[in-house]
Amino acid sequence: MLSTVNNNIVIALDAMGGDFAPLSVIHGAGFFLDNLVDPGIKVFFHIYGDKEEVSPLLLKYKKVSNNSEFTHCSDNVLANDKPSFALRHRKDSSMKAAIVAVKEGKAFGVVSSGNTGALMAISRFVLGTLPNIYRPAIASICPTKTKSFALLDLGANVDCNADSLFQFALMGSIFAKIALKIDNPEVALLNIGTEEVKGNDSVRGAFELLKNAPGINFKGYIEASEFLEGNIDVIVADGFVGNVMLKTAEATASTFINLIKQEVFNSWIAKMLVGILLKSKLNKALTRFNPKIRSGAMFLGLNGIIIKSHGNSDAISFAHAIKFAVNAISENLNQKIINGVSHIE
């Protein structure tokens, strides 16, 4: 059941998380309300933060103020806080208050640009995991040259056994159906080769669990050199490998895009030729890899929707993270995960 106020989807916002908070959060909420709300969906915000910083922004962004309720918090989680410290000592933080709002039924999901480790630790402590889920995983949508795919885990679990990887694959498949709008997503395990004998015990064990599992379109192994080809819809790895893979891909894409811009736009002749011949195609390609529209990572397997936006998110990035949360809620993602793993003993 959706958490609503007057039939609105309710999202809790951590106004103090991120490099550019609280402006990025409040402005982002306004951008979302102005540009990204789907027809027929109404969204209401519970906003948590420091009143001295947030209140002036709410006066400026009237539409956000009119569609929200603000609660003052005397503390906030810092970027360099260890998860254990944040859990024990940041008890009146905006991050924890937003998560507690989900626990108490005031909101259905949280969006935060704050400390990832602290967000996971507090969320897991306050909300717990869904039935039959051993560990939550961080999932995100990544671009390729032809389409997008879901990648998990992105850092929640550095070491994973076969059972955890198996569950990540099940959750990732359900996540992809909603996020990518694919009826039967193809799922693969990231490995150092495609032969069944390759990989460590956890990966090979997960392969055995998945190859005959019902309700999942498992395609075996995929190597890192293949993931940008766009042939697989869900790629599963442990949190260490997945995080390294994602950050390497992001850095490579950023470097490549900057090189193109430098080479093309340093010459007025090149600018003119690009404008005439390639502008629309180049813009389309650059948009596909634009991190601002892919700002949300989802914590799958928790008893509530938790979206982690990039720490350096600006207003547009944060707005897209809010949209990510609203889509997950409106599609009833967690109930579908519960149904999808109900056969696990």
From Swiss-Prot:
Its main location: cytoplasm. It catalyses: a fatty acyl-[ACP] + phosphate = an acyl phosphate + holo-[ACP]. Its EC number is 2.3.1.274. Pathway: Lipid metabolism; phospholipid metabolism. InterPro entries: FA_synthesis, Phospholipid_synth_PlsX-like. GO terms for molecular function: phosphate:acyl-[acyl carrier protein] acyltransferase activity. The keyword Glycosyltransferase does not apply. Homodimer. Probably interacts with PlsY. NCBIfam families: plsX (TIGR00182). This is Phosphate acyltransferase. It comes from Wolbachia sp. subsp. Drosophila simulans (strain wRi).
